[in-house]
Swiss-Prot record:
The keyword Transferase applies. Residues 8-158 form the MGS-like domain. Belongs to the PurH family. It comes from the Bacteria. One of its GO terms (molecular function) is phosphoribosylaminoimidazolecarboxamide formyltransferase activity. This is Bifunctional purine biosynthesis protein PurH. The IMP cyclohydrolase activity resides in the N-terminal region. Pathway: Purine metabolism; IMP biosynthesis via de novo pathway; 5-formamido-1-(5-phospho-D-ribosyl)imidazole-4-carboxamide from 5-amino-1-(5-phospho-D-ribosyl)imidazole-4-carboxamide (10-formyl THF route): step 1/1; Purine metabolism; IMP biosynthesis via de novo pathway; IMP from 5-formamido-1-(5-phospho-D-ribosyl)imidazole-4-carboxamide: step 1/1.
Amino acid sequence: MGVVAKKFPIPDLHRVRRVLLSVSDKTGVVAFAQALHAYSVELISTGGTAKVLMDAGLPVKDVAEVTGFPEIMDGRVKTLHPLIHGALLGVRQDPSHAVAMEKHGIHGIDLLVVNLYPFEKTSQSGADGQTILENIDIGGPAMIRAAAKNHAYTGVVTAVSDYDFVLAELKQHDGCLSFSMRRQLAMRAYAHTAAYDAAIATWFAQDLKIETPSWQSFSGYLENVMRYGENPHQQAAFYRNNEKRFGVATAKLLQGKALSYNNMNDTDAAFELVAEFDPQKTTAVALIKHANPCGVAEGKSLKEAYLKALMCDNVSAFGGIVALNQPLDEECAEEIVKIFTEVIIAPDATIAAREIIARKKNLRLLTTGGLPDPRCGGLVAKTLAGGILVQSRDNMVVDDLNLQVVTKRAPSQDEMRDLQFAFRVVKHVKSNAIVYAKNSATVGIGAGQMSRIDSAKIAARKAEESAQRAGLTESPTRGSVVASDAFFPFADGLLAAVEAGATALIQPGGSMRDEEVIAAADAHGLAMVFTGVRHFRH
């Protein structure tokens, strides 16, 4: 059994008479301290913070004056002292605590203002290991945890963004903090130190190249609360972490309504897909609905790529997401606004394009400043009942694979180009996934089926339907190529591709019936390439 608590009444309003300020980020601290001073609050501070406040003309007592002990070991030890921690932890209504505080000359601290050494920023800056270690804050987290534990009497502020929040409370209660406020600040404080320690543990694991540490932590700060989740009866919020990856999380919303839960999920899927296409080599557009592509294409211009992608399935594209690997231009913007679109995401957008999009006030336009690197590693997490599944990001790129021609006929140059295009796309389609492609554009996509043959049939059928809507007399799958996200367990999927008129196929290989599938390809004159890499997506 743990420590048994003694019970004392907790005051609702507690006056702030004494504050300790020790901040790494000095933003706003002078104005905050000045406001506290106006309430006759005694100011105690440390090192650099004390100097900043003194330079501003504020009466500040250095922590060394309180403890009677100087900062030592390059500032590693300055607040780790009974006169500080006793002041933070003392239970004012406990007679034994009161006696101890009086005996040792401990005067309670009613408010702690601390933000920590910038560990994450330093660890991501390319600094050497010793510099990173020096930016692990010790005294700060110790004080934060102490003050938060004793929130019955002590408020704790860990974020610059909370300064105005606290000052409004002090104004409302004439220099006092309410218990509900102190409790809320305590919750934020523990979340802050937990995230800080998680970042340190993550850095150690990465530095030691431990891919599966014994304890894995995920943390983020609240960016915004959404109206609802996937469905109106579900609550949702977005928490931001410190990953520096271009995408929806770091994008600027130039216009339109706030992004919904589904918008963010779909937009992330769209931008990750279009990032498979190197903007230095090609121009590409992806159209996404429910996190699945309904059309992807390359073109000589964004307009051409967009129209080719739209041709794949213009019905499903209605109300979807448009992702571009190049800055949105005027010509493409004029085409996009012709149908209802939820979100456009691109590295940037020209002034003329922005003016066109502004005609649709609810259309969301996001710019990211760049594309995510599809080769970059990272973790992907999925929550389960009672746990979290964690895996590395699928960062295999078709350009880096050793493609093996396994049939008698090798793909032509045009077929190989389309095969690689299709394999880029199929990586981002929910399994089981089949993609038909022709002339650097998808013409049919089959997604999320329990059997591969069904995905193949659906992809061909959707291509036929799109051709009929466009008034075409021949199915676009004639002369197309096919990509599969996983191997064909039987030859039936390949035969469905033959029936649709495909001439070449790309797949991972690895089935116990590979020879049967290869023989079927040879019998029908198909060229087939094995990649050796599977792209399941769930």
